[in-house]
Amino acid sequence: TMFFVISGFLITHHTLKRDKQFSAINLKHFYIRRAARILPCLVLLILGVSILGSFDLKPFMNQAPNGIEVSYPLTIFAALTFWMNILIIKFGWVNYALGVLWSLSVEEVFYFVFPLLCLLTRSNKVFIAVFVGVILYGPYFRSLHFGEESGAYLYHYFSSFDGIAVGCLTAIFSHKYQPNWTYKKPLSWLIILSMTALYLYAPIKEVSTWGISLFALATGLLILCFQHPSETQAHSLFTKVMVWLGQRSYETYLFHLVVLGLMKVAFIPAQTDSSIKIMLLIGYLVLTFIISAAIEKYYSTPLNSYIRKVFIKDKS
């Protein structure tokens, strides 16, 4: 939920910063930027999982958790056309390493609609009203699927759209009002403690109807508390680390299960002594960050820049 809110905030913030108003958005350029950021890593993930699966490594092969076989080509098709979440709802988590793409499916469908909505509404008030409607519809939709074993209350598009919409509205608010609250620090700690309490209160399955909405709204407030002018430089070590991780969050998210899958092959969980699991966890985190950084530096960022340079001729 937090990542959906942050994603919605960033895409709206950058749109307003670049185009000044939603009606001025360049549809072609928007889609090119999205493709340049998303597709290189997505294709690399699919190729990597396909190669590893060809060696009969279970975490990278399709399974049948609900007793229904799903072909690997169909899984790839779902990944490339952004309905992996629907595949998981219908057939379960059919591929361990590719399952993470459910959230990417949600985001990309939303962002396919986002620029169209910008052009069709023309009015900021109508634009905001649509997002408010999405936010209100979210808990109702989750209530319709409350407790379902399919996980539709979590994986479906309309189960998560409200989080992205909260992020979009947060960006609109901050762009217009640029709040400079003197009580940001105590408020941020209060929000963090409240979110922690909500997280520990009950499993998400039991509080999905309202819990996801509250978490999204709290995340939006937290973004406002931590927002700084774009020219502000990170000074503390913690801030620098968080910025570094944030810049590579997409690569980390997409490939963390590849690393974990390989470790599960080498160290079968049921047969691994608990005394070394902490060391494995540390090794897993370090290896994931190293691989993500390498992919970002030598693959995704260069390709992102190249695609934009070729297909976007102006400086926007």
Predicted regions and their residues:
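Hydrophobic transmembrane-helix microenvironments that flank and shape a buried ionizable site
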Residues: 4, 10, 31-37, 82, ...
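Hydrophobic alpha-helical transmembrane segments of multipass membrane transporters and ion channels
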Residues: 36, 40-44, 48, 251-255
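Hydrophobic alpha-helical segments with transmembrane-like composition
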Residues: 38, 86-133, 157-161, 171, ...
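Membrane-interface helix-loop-helix regions
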Residues: 46-104, 137-152, 162, 215-220, ...
